[in-house]
Amino acid sequence: MDDDNGLELSLGLSCGGSTGKAKGNNNNNAGSSSENYRAEGGDRSAKVIDDFKNFLHPTSQRPAEPSSGSQRSDSGQQPPQNFFNDLSKAPTTEAEASTKPLWVEDESRKEAGNKRKFGFPGMNDDKKKEKDSSHVDMHEKKTKASHVSTATDEGSTAENEDVAESEVGGGSSSNHAKEVVRPPTDTNIVDNLTGQRRSNHGGSGTEEFTMRNMSYTVPFTVHPQNVVTSMPYSLPTKESGQHAAATSLLQPNANAGNLPIMFGYSPVQLPMLDKDGSGGIVALSQSPFAGRVPSNSATAKGEGKQPVAEEGSSEDASERPTGDNSNLNTAFSFDFSAIKPGMAADVKFGGSGARPNLPWVSTTGSGPHGRTISGVTYRYNANQIKIVCACHGSHMSPEEFVRHASEEYVSPESSMGMTAASAHT
């Protein structure tokens, strides 16, 4: 036996000659097999190189393949370094050729990209211009709207100032009040009345006349010689002196909104029916004063359909009778002889006490149940007065007041009766 190094491992036997021959044959076979192996390796490397070249340059012409015999002889003569030399040489030349079109493509792409970039700024400029123009338009619209709104506000304030100036009445007086006139055409009437008052009274001792449209409309307002009212009818009045004129200012009462209107009178002033047949009511007064309205729950039990107005300083047109002032206390009379001015001596008051400055009247009933009752008069409308009895707080006409005095007395439902003259501020 021999190993790879040619060492003889066989035993020393008699067949030594045969072993020597075999060794020589084996050496020859080993040399030929190594040459064959090298030739086949060279063929394979040449094929790999050719395939690589064909892959890099598919259009290049492939060289004629030599026969296998020549390849084997060439490969046997070529040293083993040719394979590496070919690999180092071929890729460099072919890589240079293959990279050229790639650089061309990159340059073309860059040029196209630059063209696109040059195209976009123009579009961007157009878009910016459009946005700027739209912003300018919006700003102009806003400024126009603001000018319009300020103009309307200025117009409205000017109108309000004109209305306020038109509502202010002329005249020099010690008492001034706000004047609210509805509709605006009534301002002419007020101006005319102011001029007439100045010419008639000379501006001495007169008070300013004011009109006021309340939520609950006052049915009438009387001024001497000049009847001013929001109703289609007028009241006949007379004037015999300079100081008999009075003004009326009605104010709503916030405590009781369903009580009738109460007019204040002086202690010697009582309303009386006009005997001339005109149907109007004339009130006689001596001096102005401030009267108040009873706003108690007991006074609300009557008819209670007229709104309440609290008197600040209220007087109607008055007539001064002939004679001295001492006769004023006895010069008044009602058509109903049973009703007399003043109050009964036994009338009791609750709440804050009596109000002697109210227009009190009293009457004595007839019959078995007749008694003396007292009440406060007030003007119900232009042609009628009513009386609020102190015993029950009922609103009734003079005839009903007389009949009420003749009826049997029934205690009021609440303990707060007989407080018709009490006022709550």
Swiss-Prot record:
- Keywords for this entry? Jasmonic acid signaling pathway, Nucleus, Plant defense, Repressor, Transcription, Transcription regulation
Extent of Basic and acidic residues compositional bias = 37-54, 124-140
Q: Which Gene Ontology cellular component terms are annotated?
A: nucleus
Which parts of this chain are annotated as the region Disordered?
A: 1-207, 288-327
Kindly list the biological process annotations in GO that this record carries: defense response; jasmonic acid mediated signaling pathway; negative regulation of DNA-templated transcription; regulation of leaf morphogenesis; response to jasmonic acid
Q: Which Pfam families match?
A: TDBD
Similarity comment: Belongs to the Ninja family.
**Predominant location:** nucleus
Please give the record's induction comment.
By jasmonate.
UniProt-recorded name of the protein:
AFP homolog 2
* Reported impact of L11A: Loss of interaction with TOPLESS, but no effect on the interaction with TIFY10A/JAZ1
Q: What else is known?
A: Unlike the JAZ proteins, the stability of AFPH2/NINJA is unaffected by jasmonate.
**What does the record note on quaternary structure?**
Component of a complex at least composed of TOPLESS, TPR2, TPR3, TIFY4B/PPD2, MYC3/ATR2 and TIFY3B/JAZ12. Interacts (via C-terminus) with TIFY10A/JAZ1; TIFY10B/JAZ2; TIFY6B/JAZ3; TIFY6A/JAZ4; TIFY11A/JAZ5; TIFY11B/JAZ6; TIFY7/JAZ9; TIFY9/JAZ10; TIFY3A/JAZ11; TIFY3B/JAZ12; TIFY4A/PPD1; TIFY4B/PPD2 and TIFY8 (via TIFY domain). Interacts with TOPLESS. Interacts with PAT1H1.
Name the job this protein performs: Acts as a transcriptional repressor. Negative regulator of jasmonate responses. Connects the JAZ proteins and the non-JAZ protein TIFY8 with the TOPLESS corepressors.
* Ranges of Low complexity composition bias in the record: 20-34, 66-81
Q: Could you tell me which residues belong to the region Necessary and sufficient for the interaction with the JAZ proteins?
A: 322-425
Compartments where found? Nucleus
Annotated region (Necessary and sufficient for the interaction with TOPLESS), positions in chain: 7-17
Q: Which spans does this entry mark as compositional bias, Polar residues?
A: 146-158, 185-197, 288-299
Q: Which domain of life is it from?
A: Eukaryota
